[in-house]
Structures are given as C-alpha cells and as structure tokens.
C-alpha cells in the first residue's frame, strides 16, 4: 500500500531521535535554570524525518509584558548561545534560530499564561496546543498526521506563513483528531464546499474565512484563518484524485522535463539588501504581484499569470503575458451622442469621430507600453533591493518550469 511505503520514508528512526536528543542536550545546558519546554511537532511526535526543526519555548511571567520579551528576554537567550551558530528571526516578536549539526532549533521567548484563551502573544498558546494534541493522538494517529503533512507538502499547501497561506502543522493534527485518519480526511475534503466548518469545540465568535476550525484551546481563534481559498481548492481536488488513483507522486512530486515557453514571460530576480521578517517581506511581495497584474491589465496587456517564489533574501517574480508587444496608440471608446458628457469628451480628446453605433471614439496614446518598465514600477518593497530582469527564452530552472507547466504533476 502506498501509505505504508511513504511512512517508511517519512517516519523518523530511533537513530534520528537520538540525534535530535543530542542537540537538545546542548540547548538544555545553555538554558539551565530558565523556565523552558520543548514544543512543536518533535514534542508531539508528529515530526517528519529530515524535517528537523525543533521549537524550544522559554517562558517568562505574563506580568513582564510583551516588550520584555523583545528586549530583556531576547538578550538573555542570546548571551547563553552566542558562541553557537545562530541568527535572529522575526515573527510577532524576535526569536533566535540556532544551527547545531544541521538541525535548526528555534528558541522563542513567550509568556506563561493560565490557558490558551488568555494568550497575550500568539506563541503563548503553544504549550496548550501540545497538551491537546498529545492527549488526543495515539501512536497510529501520529503516523496519520505524518501522512497528511507529507501529502500537503507534496501538493504545495503546507505552511501557514504568508508566503504559502497553507495548513499549519497544528491544523493537520486537528484534522486527524476530528476525522480519525488520513484516508478519512481525504474522503471528507474531496467533498468540501466552502464555507467549511470543523468544530472540535464550539466557536466563541463568528468567523468569515472559507475554512473554519475553532481552536480547542482558544475558541475565539480560527486555526485555519490563514489558509487561502486557492489552497483549500487544491487540497480538495488532490484528495479526490488521490482516492481515485493513489500514487506516490502526491507525496513526492517528480521533476518534469523542460516546458515550452507560451506567450512572453518576464522574469524579475530580486536580491534584498536588508534582513526583515518573512511575513513582512511576503506581504509586500504579494501586494507587488497584485499591483503588477492590475497595472499591466490597465495599460492594455493581456495577462496570463503572475507568481512569486523564493525566500526572504532572493525572490523571483514571473509575469506571463499573451504578448509583450502592444501598440503605442489605442481606441478610446466614448459616450453616446445624446450623453451629457460629450462636450467633456470632445474637449479632452483629439482624433475624434462618431461611430456607426452613434458613439464617440478617439485615438489615445498609451502613457506606458513597455511591460518590463510597468512591472518594475509596481514593485512595492520597502527594503532596499537589487533587481535583474529578462525575457525568458529557455530555462532549466525547476521553479520556472513549474510556473510554465501550471498543471501539478499529480493531476496529469
């Protein structure tokens, strides 16, 4: 059975666990006498082999407040690990990423609160998530979560960060707890029609998102608020096709051969000079993508697709047009002859005539007719960056080929 094959690949071995424990031993020594806990998928037993990010939360009394976490707590943590390979990262507040033996450990300052619904910062709920999941999943359930995570990774809908807008690890765990197993999740997801409500607890507010899973530890929060409709639809379609024809391709998509360039494709390579929060950068990138598409359409280009991918330092924006060539002049359609606005139209336009349909027309010159210039002008990044741009001829870049292909490998 395919799921058993996949599980053999993704389930950590005892050797893997020992390797993680050795790394944690180093961290435990550094955080000695602090109130800290290992959280996340490693603690819950739902982590995937070779996906070895570990979450360690250092808790401080809730009375010290959020500002204390950003300054005092962070400095305390840095002083304890400063001789190790570490970098600063940014979410709601800064935290530290330590790299030991190619294992990333996120050390996150948080506030110790009485319950999940009393959280002051988003991460304060984490220990309650851990307790909820570990008390509702047995060993088989943890394997079912692993299968669901790998399936979602394979089809590109895993990850709650703004760049992906997909399912979080916690969301996959709740789906398994609610439906019972991997296959059952797919059976139900294949029939989804939004809005979809999955209630492990009664919600404490009205949610408007397409997929609603009230958080069992804080019912005022929707666990899947960040999941885009595109990713919900992709997951539902993938579930339907997997149940019809199970294949390892859903879990581990193959790389396809070179895809033909259709239309004209502009590639914009952005290299960011400054470090910033991933969600902040990707919020600006997504706004840029939308702005580029709107502007090109406004100037008369027929846009096929605009997408972006990359990390927080190197980002690619791909713009696919039916054609990059567009006339310097265009037909401007005016009002009907009996309209009260014809005088205004005549005053503002040249080369005016009355059409056979009784409507006024004119010829106007486009303010801008170079697609590359328009695209560059509509990038709205607030950090400094360098940009390289070119029109695609051919490529061996897997991400660009994926962009050109459009169709996921599991679909066809």
Swiss-Prot record:
Residues binding Mg(2+) are: 53, 55, 106
Report the superkingdom from the record: Archaea
Q: For this UniProt record, give its keywords in alphabetical order, as a comma-separated list.
A: ATP-binding, Magnesium, Metal-binding, Nucleotide-binding, Nucleotidyltransferase, RNA repair, RNA-binding, Transferase, tRNA processing
A single GO BP term for this record reads: RNA repair
The Swiss-Prot or TrEMBL record lists the needed cofactor(s) as: Mg(2+)
Tell me the InterPro entries matching this sequence: CAA_C, CCA-adding_arc, CCA_tRNA_nucleotrans_2, NT_2-5OAS_ClassI-CCAase, NT_sf, NuclTrfase_I-like_C, Polymerase_NTP_transf_dom, tRNA_NucTransf2
Sequence positions that bind CTP:
41, 44, 129, 149, 158
Q: Which positions are annotated as binding ATP?
A: 41, 44, 129, 149, 158
Its recorded reaction(s) are: a tRNA precursor + 2 CTP + ATP = a tRNA with a 3' CCA end + 3 diphosphate; a tRNA with a 3' CCA end + 2 CTP + ATP = a tRNA with a 3' CCACCA end + 3 diphosphate
Give the EC number(s) listed in the UniProt record. 2.7.7.72
Family (UniProt)? Belongs to the tRNA nucleotidyltransferase/poly(A) polymerase family. Archaeal CCA-adding enzyme subfamily.
Task: Provide the assembly information.
Answer: Homodimer.
Instruction: Spell out the protein name for this chain.
Output: CCA-adding enzyme
Q: Which organism is it from?
A: Saccharolobus solfataricus (strain ATCC 35092 / DSM 1617 / JCM 11322 / P2) (Sulfolobus solfataricus)
